[in-house]
Amino acid sequence: MKEATDVFNHWAHLGKDEGMERGHANAVNEMIDVAMERVLEGRVAFSAVDLGCGNGWVVRKLSQHPACVEAVGYDGAEHMIEKAKEGDFINTYHCAKFPETKPEKTYQFVHSMEFLYYLKDPKGMLQSIHDDWLEEGGWAVIGIDHYAEHEESLSWPEALEVHMSTFSEAEWIQMWNDVGFQEIHAWRANARDGKPGTLAILGKKA
């Protein structure tokens, strides 16, 4: 099996990151809109981090929000981080190894799209997001396209020769409960035209 970071490094060279951005935009926009209703409740400003940020497109989007005071991106693929830095001189990007990497500070909003299931221990990373990355009272939203109910996605690990951790919607939601998240809300973002959509899960560190 290939390392996921090697696959994404290759895709960055091929320019596939731009296609990923277009393909994920509708789901991500919906996820952020839903999350912001909670993040900005009783708060006039927020800091944000995108884990598995790729070429930085979500970081750039978040930084343009009028209430965002800081937006940071982390990714394990070196060439993705290079592309992010080349296209953005304002925000900060880090090449990181997960789940080992821990932040120097906590954030009020954590976003992640198509990242968690590439890890062999996604629950451990989710625990770290809750314990290490989020400020108390902060919110996390995570998008997952590879899950048991999305039957088309079940062939992806073999097709890409990359490890993917496969769980059902209920199992993913239970992980959020297990690691301590509260006010958990799960839905399928951008579900249309007979497609199951992105499993989006939102939760708060209380």
Where are these regions (language model features)?
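A short glycine-rich, Lys/Arg-flanked "PGG" loop and its adjoining helix->strand segment in the class I
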Residues: 123-136
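Short alpha-helix
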Residues: 164-179
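Conserved class I S-adenosyl-L-methionine
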Residues: 1-40, 148-149
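Short, glycine-/aromatic-enriched active-site segment of Class I SAM-dependent methyltransferases
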Residues: 145-163
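Core SAM-dependent methyltransferase catalytic element
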Residues: 188-206
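A conserved beta-strand element that flanks and buttresses the S-adenosyl-L-methionine
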Residues: 111
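Class I SAM-dependent methyltransferase SAM/SAH-binding core
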Residues: 49-51, 55-100
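Conserved beta-strand signature within the Rossmann-like core of class I S-adenosyl-L-methionine
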Residues: 137-145
